[in-house]
Amino acid sequence: MTEYKNIIVTGGAGFIGSNFVHYVYNNHPDVHVTVLDKLTYAGNRANLEEILGDRVELVVGDIADSELVDKLAAKADAIVHYAAESHNDNSLKDPSPFIYTNFVGTYILLEAARKYDIRFHHVSTDEVYGDLPLREDLPGHGEGPGEKFTAETKYNPSSPYSSTKAASDLIVKAWVRSFGVKATISNCSNNYGPYQHIEKFIPRQITNILSGIKPKLYGEGKNVRDWIHTNDHSTGVWAILTKGRIGETYLIGADGEKNNKEVLELILEKMSQPKNAYDHVTDRAGHDLRYAIDSTKLREELGWKPQFTNFEEGLEDTIKWYTEHEDWWKAEKEAVEANYAKTQKILN
């Protein structure tokens, strides 16, 4: 196992990145973390407020700023790259920030890792693989060969967001082969937990209910996502960073397949609302049907396994967090719903 003393976490003030920083802070006291975050709408200094100090430093800046990245990389022994524009709906309206941050930003970071010969881990998404048929339409009912994503699945991105993440994955692979950069890649399924921006599916529904707004469901809600608690994602990334083989791709998943309708109705039930108290709205353009991850490689090779496997308990904890942290999300709620209203038409 490789040990690190000084790591850079890009996007470490965002949802998944800040949870990773909290994980490192709480479990690896000898590691100093420099968070590099542009603090766009999806980043929040408050996500790190309680741990900023001698062991966690926040640098506000752009991952595509080569001079800043060079300065930070010169003092680091690893870069863990979370920073990304990640909201599919936004990528359909304006793809340009996704190309700039997800592709150009990754290139700048790779060049710094190459220059200083430091470890690089690239955090990516299962959306680079496109989507899968529903379990009921497959001969193996979702468990047969090719019925879940693996590291060998061909890339088939279907949105501007996922295409820029696929492109960034590919340049990481190229920099490993062409320049010997010590890099790994992880592709993860849908995360949930604290600090997630309220434009995302689960926190949007929770905060709608808390705000007296009817939740919204794309289409019929048949689209399936493979949910994983963000804390399990953090331990998976740490396992890859410290034990993963250079040049390899590992998929992080917790066997949490549920369709959107099922998740929304569970949220309503947990919040003491009628299970049908939501509106169907027009579906997202090119909406991927099903995601499902086979994480066998990560589990068998690196000994990782998820701990937060009870989705209902994890969802209850998440609902409790948003209920108790209204000051964290309330100011943005009106603007988020106004943005959705521009493209979503109520069907029922």
From Swiss-Prot:
Binds 1 NAD(+) per subunit. Its EC number is 4.2.1.46. Pathway: Carbohydrate biosynthesis; dTDP-L-rhamnose biosynthesis. It is an enzyme of class 4 (lyase). Its cofactor is NAD(+). Substrate binds at residues 86, 88, 125, 190, 200-205, 216-218, 225, 260, 283-287. NAD(+) binds at residues 15-16, 37-40, 62-63, 82-86, 101, 161-165, 191. One of its GO terms (molecular function) is dTDP-glucose 4,6-dehydratase activity. It catalyses: dTDP-alpha-D-glucose = dTDP-4-dehydro-6-deoxy-alpha-D-glucose + H2O. GO terms for biological process: dTDP-rhamnose biosynthetic process; lipopolysaccharide biosynthetic process; polysaccharide biosynthetic process. This is dTDP-glucose 4,6-dehydratase. Gene3D superfamilies: NAD(P)-binding Rossmann-like Domain, UDP-galactose 4-epimerase, domain 1. Belongs to the NAD(P)-dependent epimerase/dehydratase family. dTDP-glucose dehydratase subfamily. The keyword Iron-sulfur does not apply. Homodimer. It holds the Pfam family GDP_Man_Dehyd. Keywords: Lipopolysaccharide biosynthesis, Lyase, NAD. PANTHER family: DTDP-D-GLUCOSE 4,6-DEHYDRATASE-RELATED. Catalyzes the dehydration of dTDP-D-glucose to form dTDP-6-deoxy-D-xylo-4-hexulose via a three-step process involving oxidation, dehydration and reduction.
